[in-house]
Amino acid sequence: QIEYGGNKLLCEDVLAEALDDHGFPSTVVYFSMVYGPRNIIPDREQRMFARLEAGRPVLIPGDGTTVFQVGHVDDQARAMEAISRAPVTVGRRYNITGKHFQSDLGYVATTAAHIGVEPDLRFIPAATMDSLWDGDLEVEAGSTSKANIDIRTSPEARRRQTSVRHRFRFATVMPRLAPNIHRWNRSVVFGIEALKRDTDWEPRHDLASMVAQTHAWHEETGGREYDWAYEDELLEILG
């Protein structure tokens, strides 16, 4: 676990202790990836918009069947409000995400269909992805990307540091939740039934409506410029 995730776990311990000792009301909520306008991580859906609009190749890890989830920011804000109004949620843990899940290929296809382009798919062989994930394949472009990682001096620790940095860098190519924890082809799906049961909350968006609403915002605001050097080097490795 990196420092960011470790600190969240420590915070949970503090809140649980405050509830047990002082009756301090708290609820722990685990988010999957947030999707929507003004996302503070622009390398997810916003980068995919820009990639497809520019006609760039879309790199697909493995066979593209890995499954993940995103949740729209408006749905998740409504969920947080519902939690704050439901006393039964105190002292409990919940997941918040969208009502559906999709494969990497489905994510790209839905986004491309809305934009009105045919994606140029480039598949990265599983063996290449394994080498990238394990830090055995060095990709120079973007290697200065910063991540808050505990660094030791042993060769194994340096290799692990390299692999974790590459994993987070690759998450700008295809969204991955906690790439420091999950393997590149590990499907990650959250259950939201407990939250729905305890709060009567229900997500309103599916992926298609998330794309439509967020891409409209993207067009209205003019998008942003992206550096494609990392992806270009991956494409060069693939030949």
Enumerate the predicted regions with their spans.
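Short-chain dehydrogenase/reductase
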Residues: Q1-D13, P42-Q46, Q69-V70, F101, ...
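Conserved beta-loop-beta element that borders a ligand/cofactor-binding pocket
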Residues: C11-R38
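Substrate-positioning beta->alpha
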Residues: P42-M48, P61-S84, G91-R92, G106
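A short C-terminal helix-loop "cap" of Rossmann-like NAD(P)-dependent dehydrogenase/epimerase domains
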Residues: F49-P61, H114-R122
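Glycine/small-residue-rich pyrophosphate-binding loop that anchors the diphosphate of NDP-sugar donors
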Residues: V67, W184-S187
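Residue-level signal for the nucleotide or nucleotide-sugar donor/cofactor binding architecture
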Residues: G71, Q102, F190, H205
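Mid/C-terminal beta-alpha module of Rossmann-like enzyme folds, strongest
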Residues: A82-N180, I192-A194, D198, A212, ...
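Amphipathic terminal alpha-helices
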Residues: D206-G239
